Amino acid sequence: EIAQNLGCLTVAIVTKPFKFEGKKRMDYALVGLDELRKHIDTIVIIPNDRLRDLIDRSTPLNAAFQEVDNVLRIGVQSISDLISVPGLVNLDFADVRTIMEHRGDALIGIGVGFGENRAVEAAKQAVNSPLLETSIVGATDAIINVTGGTNLTLFEVEEAAEVIRQSANTDINTIFGAVINENLNDEVIVTVIATGFDDAREQIGGGLDNSLPQNTSYM
């Protein structure tokens, strides 16, 4: 609330309780979300139950909770990196504010692709992560950032952007960035922040092919 009153861009990245924690705890969380929405520009919600899609039955409990913390960290870092990491096509804070100010629910996704179709695979992973509560379907605005090595091509950048536009299923307005990272070899990383969802937005299950490997998806 203080940050909002100071005119700061306020973004919340939060989790919802596991179902096994009980209805009362979930009800408290939902009330908290409703109150939080009054004081922020944008919110990204990650249901803890979807964590099971990223771990197996042998994963220790403490490691599972560490994975939740890691997802939250990556979400925050993905926003800060868009602003702070210099790019071939730069994004700045004004771009992030344009997409995220007074926008309500948001999607933040990161995907990594390898090989011949690496850019397409990375883009599909970014919009189809099992941890995201909101599908990109119905988004009206998005930031798309593509990071690759010195061999990143114009065609790959175009392919990644087209996957995201088609997945949104709307005439989506996009702000685009591209980064050349000489430390990357075969991989391409795609980051997408999407906002502007209407009340009829679809929940996860929409979008493109969900059968892509999940072990290389950051979020």
Predicted regions located by residue number:
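Tubulin/FtsZ superfamily GTPase core signature
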Residues: 1-219
